[in-house]
Amino acid sequence: QENVMEKVFKKSLPSRIFATHRRKIDSYQELFNLCPNIIGPEMYRLGCECPAPEYCFTVEYNEEYGVDIDIEFFEAVAERKEDSELIKFKELPEVPVALCVNHYGAYEHMPETFAELFAYAETNGYEVIDRARFCHIDGIWNKETVDEWMTEIQLPIKLS
């Protein structure tokens, strides 16, 4: 595996309105059912429209890696709708600078890539100002093999 430091890049993350769903899951495999079979139909029922460019990500609230993953799913929508039991709407402000790295492969190995990105931020004196976003770009829905899956890990920072 290449050195993460050679693959880190910076970008801004736009202010958007998001449909969100938070719950505890036992493993990342549950996302394969949660997104298309629970979140998707509820967003459709509420009349959500997802504008281009599409932007969805997950945020984890656990302090340590393990089971009972406290996760929140965010998907950008054109406008705020009325909250439901499953879906809450939030507006997130722009993130002027995020350190990013692309993780390829299974979700179970993302904690190692995240740890390397976090270490890179600390080593280079960046102040982390919010939780990391795990933006699932390529996955089971559009790729043949797990090795082709790509998740962009976005770490909001403040430049010193």
Identify the residue ranges that each predicted region occupies.
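A solvent-exposed interaction/effector surface
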Residues: 1-160
